[in-house]
Amino acid sequence: MKKEKAVVVFSGGQDSTTCLFWAIEQFAEVEAVTFNYNQRHKLEIDCAAEIAKELGIKHTVLDMSLLNQLAPNALTRTDMEITHEEGELPSTFVDGRNLLFLSFAAVLAKQVGARHIVTGVCETDFSGYPDCRDVFVKSLNVTLNLSMDYPFVIHTPLMWINKAETWKLSDELGAFEFVREKTLTCYNGIIGDGCGECPACQLRKAGLDTYLQEREGANN
């Protein structure tokens, strides 16, 4: 894959930044695409742009604000509380988000001569999101290939690993401190270790604590 080109679906968060570093290792040329869907914190887009600039990656931002019009949710509406009731999808779930993001990423990839698409979706920590499942990604991969008559390959480096293992991967890629200090995972828009209170921060911290304990144990 070293001679080929890839497009990374990129939010500036822990997972997609780890995937960006993974793609840089795997491919000769990498571009990143970020989607503006009127998310609560535009800082997410700024963060993604800053990371791409620092890494020398061509970065495209696409307007997907129609998602907020079609599917109001807690990620785009400040008047909606972030909740997750047992047996229900979290209020942060956006209907069709990954379907649309991957579809538009594929259109961009074909235009720039890339057949590889990289996304940070993960079934291990997927929080009940149906569009993070491996079966969905594989199904969409086939659909995209048929719809554009183009040999896309969607890569999901994080699909079967948990948050602690994602931290481990970033460390193996030489990007641990970069990911920890410069990415934005927090629903409240705080870069780095975040607010520590929202579900995204709690999941990130739990994984970080577990990995640091494992790393310390391995070094002793």
From Swiss-Prot:
Provide the catalytic activity annotation.
7-carboxy-7-deazaguanine + NH4(+) + ATP = 7-cyano-7-deazaguanine + ADP + phosphate + H2O + H(+)
Has UniProt tagged this entry with the keyword Ligase? yes
In the UniProt record, the signal sequence range is none
- The kind of enzyme this is, by top-level EC class, is ligase
What is a single Pfam family found in this protein's UniProt entry?
A: QueC
Q: Name one GO molecular function term.
A: ATP binding
Q: Which UniProt keywords apply?
A: ATP-binding, Ligase, Metal-binding, Nucleotide-binding, Queuosine biosynthesis, Zinc
The cross-references to CDD domains, in alphabetical order and at most eight, read: QueC-like
Q: Which residues bind ATP?
A: F10, S11, G12, G13, Q14, D15, S16, T17, T18, C19, L20
- What biological-process terms (Gene Ontology) are attached? queuosine biosynthetic process
The organism's superkingdom is given as Bacteria
How does the cofactor attach, per the note? Answer: Binds 1 zinc ion per subunit.
Similarity-based family: Belongs to the QueC family.
Quaternary structure and interacting proteins, as annotated:
Homodimer.
Q: Quote the function comment for this protein.
A: Catalyzes the ATP-dependent conversion of 7-carboxy-7-deazaguanine (CDG) to 7-cyano-7-deazaguanine (preQ(0)).
Q: What is this protein called?
A: 7-cyano-7-deazaguanine synthase
Its source organism is Bacillus cereus (strain B4264)
